[in-house]
């Protein structure tokens, strides 16, 4: 077996461990948090967490895709890697300053956020962690072993802290701070590894590189914003319209779905930089790799969707417990998402983005975001968390369909 295949498989395994720590380790505390906080306070927790995820999305700006691709193409040149690294870091510093100003204004001026200001600010460590955690550097250089180490250590650290310090329904802010601190700890460990390995040179500030970095990531940022509109945004709108209990039911079911779906991420994250670099050298080999990825992801995603559909009642009963009756219905409605998202990841990220169709990719996700806005208000008003689940499913169906049509119409998978 050649070195490239061994390297790819090794990276998939490392990323599987990373995703296991990201999704499965928090599941050790998930049932405890759900039961300790109760449906209403767990809903408040989810509402504030979703708000902070929007802030993180702004700071992330799509660099996990664009910077990964840039690093993958320049992995053998320390000077180029250094230039890309500092351009992204300084870009993120600009974005985090804007974010903190906006967050301060929001918690002062919006009554719903003012009421939960302490809880919202308890999630800020995750924002800082996103700034200093260069996942894109590790992925671009295909050095997943170190990414695995930093992720596992940080996730393990928060487990005992949750059981020790979160004891009553009122400990929402403590729970938020502990959960969000995992990203910060992971970022500190990752930066120490980067320095120790000598992957980057001295600090270089180039305004031209910062502007170019922001420009390169703009269309992906618009795309991720649109995705957040119909994923994270649904939780926020549901909270405003239907209240924290509905958010608690939706968030509980969606957490189970994300835990299973997240197991697909090792394959998608490991193969993306490999596809990017392979297409540059040999398009035919790149297309063959994409088709293999499509087969693998669709089969696994389909199996996960069946597990969620057929096992919804058991999964909710075991992981959540009593008081979350509507979570079973929500989980059944959103059960097709792992299959749909596995397809849209291939057609959108692995095909459209690697072929430089960033604008078209953005337009599809913007259309999906607009559809979610049209559906979310009437459906959540009428059906609360069930309406939110229907909105999410309908939006993902549109995304997958449009991406599939674009790829086929432009014959992007024809060698």
Curated annotation (Swiss-Prot):
Pathway: Bacterial outer membrane biogenesis; LPS O-antigen biosynthesis
CDD domains: MATE_Wzx_like
Main location: membrane
GO biological process, one term: O antigen biosynthetic process
Keywords attached to this entry: Cell inner membrane, Cell membrane, Lipopolysaccharide biosynthesis, Membrane, Transmembrane, Transmembrane helix, Transport
Subcellular location: Cell inner membrane
Gene Ontology CC: plasma membrane
TM annotation in the entry: 12-32, 42-62, 84-104, 118-138, 174-194, 221-241, 296-316, 329-349, 363-383, 386-406
Short name of any one Pfam family annotated for the protein: Polysacc_synt
Topology in the lipid bilayer: Multi-pass membrane protein
InterPro entries with a match to the protein in the record: Poly_Biosynth_Transport, Polysacc_synth
Cytoplasmic side, ranges: 1-11, 63-83, 139-173, 242-295, 350-362, 407-415
Top-level division of the source organism's lineage: Bacteria
Topological region Periplasmic: 33-41, 105-117, 195-220, 317-328, 384-385
Biological role: May be involved in the translocation process of the nascent O-polysaccharide molecules and/or its ligation to lipid A core units.
PANTHER family tied to this protein: O-ANTIGEN TRANSPORTER-RELATED (PTHR30250:SF11), PST FAMILY PREDICTED COLANIC ACID TRANSPORTER (PTHR30250)
Family, similarity comment: Belongs to the polysaccharide synthase family.
Protein name per Swiss-Prot or TrEMBL: Putative O-antigen transporter
Organism, scientific name: Escherichia coli (strain K12)
